[in-house]
């Protein structure tokens, strides 16, 4: 029997490379569909953030007409409870998101700032309406030109006043950002092992400063 050796020609049209197809291992595909492949730390963060974004407890702080639109989102027509944010709290210590709906006056600014400081971590702020975003049409001495001058804001909802759908979209944007945050853990796990950092509460850390204060600030100061 005679054998003929033919040199491979990559430019030949017998089996061009662009038409070649690869077949995945069926066992590997089945494992990837049914087994979670990843680090335990990422799984913990994603699970905690999923629970956080679906259990936002807002602190209702309405200062103007935007609060009427905010209250409308709680009705059956818009049903804010679909997003887990219908549990309105009357105390900042039980809330984790502040919705500033309306005009922020200079007299009200210290109150907003004090209530924000009383909220527990993690906490977020939604600025609802043109007045809360930038002062709106009230460019006068008695109106703060944007609530972000006194507290940090995570989401701005435009409008005068914004429709309930706009507030719901802003809430969804906040939920999307929460899923990407890193959860502050009391116990850390890394390559060196498991350790628990000494995290002093903010209240205890500033206790000496509070005791040392002799001249309290006036209620109308920022």
Curated annotation (Swiss-Prot):
Keyword Magnesium annotated: no
GO cellular component: plasma membrane; respiratory chain complex I
Positions of the UniProt region annotated as Disordered: 198-222
Localization terms from the record: Cell inner membrane
InterPro entries membership: NADH_UbQ_OxRdtase-like_20kDa (IPR006137), NADH_UQ_OxRdtase_20Kd_su (IPR006138)
Membrane topology of the entry: Peripheral membrane protein
CC cofactor: [4Fe-4S] cluster
UniProt enzyme class: translocase
Comment on bound cofactor: Binds 1 [4Fe-4S] cluster.
GO MF entry, a single one: NADH dehydrogenase (ubiquinone) activity
Domain of life, source organism: Bacteria
Subunit structure: NDH-1 is composed of 14 different subunits. Subunits NuoB, C, D, E, F, and G constitute the peripheral sector of the complex.
Protein known as: NADH-quinone oxidoreductase subunit B
Species this protein is from: Psychrobacter cryohalolentis (strain ATCC BAA-1226 / DSM 17306 / VKM B-2378 / K5)
Recorded name of the encoding gene: nuoB
